[in-house]
């Protein structure tokens, strides 16, 4: 974990310190994958003080280089957050549900269960001081999720609440990067001439993510185990690693013949082809080293 203070008044876990099971965190996951996740220790922070204004202040204090003067929009499981969002109630419900579930099963609290994930979209335009001062009002001026157009599905719905094309594309890239098999399925169906159907299927997955937050604050908590299934999946999907390993091995052991295999449609996906090319380069380098 980063050695920087998670809050101005509280120092988070340092170096090899063991994280206490009682500690609670808000994890800000940015749409720009080059910006690492921001963990905010809220163990000693009253939930009533946590709102979008507080989240923006924390982001700009702890990630100033990437967020200063940028428009910041927050999403929780597809729900756009504003000053009217009941973040305090959701935090209480989330952590109470996790705690009650562990008490019922007699298990200890896993570190991941104490993480409450919020997505942050970093805007591309720079805001003036006046616009920064009225940023919360801009959130309130956007339509609610219930008033979004029903014709568009998935992340395309965000256009109706003021998101730019670039911001939507950043969010979509992060979503697809998390699930590497989506890219593979896209290529497979595109080769079969079913690209339009596949695009609709992926939009449906995006729609499921957009709507997944609507029922998590209700009921008896039976769905608590799946509440963060989209958020807690690591960005580096294991399927990516398998494709890279397969491609590098094919390129290294088959050499130039591996490039010929790339000509067969449907045999390798795009990620595997890139890895094959890298494997061929490694093969050539070994040949040069042995030659000398």
UniProtKB/Swiss-Prot annotation:
It comes from Saccharomyces cerevisiae (strain ATCC 204508 / S288c) (Baker's yeast). Residues 1-243, 292 are extracellular. The keyword Hydrolase does not apply. One of its GO terms (biological process) is endocytosis. It is found in: Endoplasmic reticulum membrane. Component of the DSC E3 ligase complexes composed of at least TUL1, DSC2, DSC3, UBX3, CDC48 as well as VLD1 for the vacuole-localized complex or GLD1 for the Golgi/endosome-localized complex. This is DSC E3 ubiquitin ligase complex subunit 3. InterPro entries: Dsc3, Dsc3_C, Dsc3_ub-like_dom. The keyword Membrane applies. GO terms for cellular component: Dsc E3 ubiquitin ligase complex; endoplasmic reticulum; endoplasmic reticulum membrane; fungal-type vacuole lumen; Golgi membrane. Residues 265-273 are cytoplasmic. Belongs to the dsc3 family. It comes from the Eukaryota. The chain crosses the membrane at residues 244-264, 274-291. Glycans are attached at residues 11, 41, 77, 99, 145. The gene is DSC3.
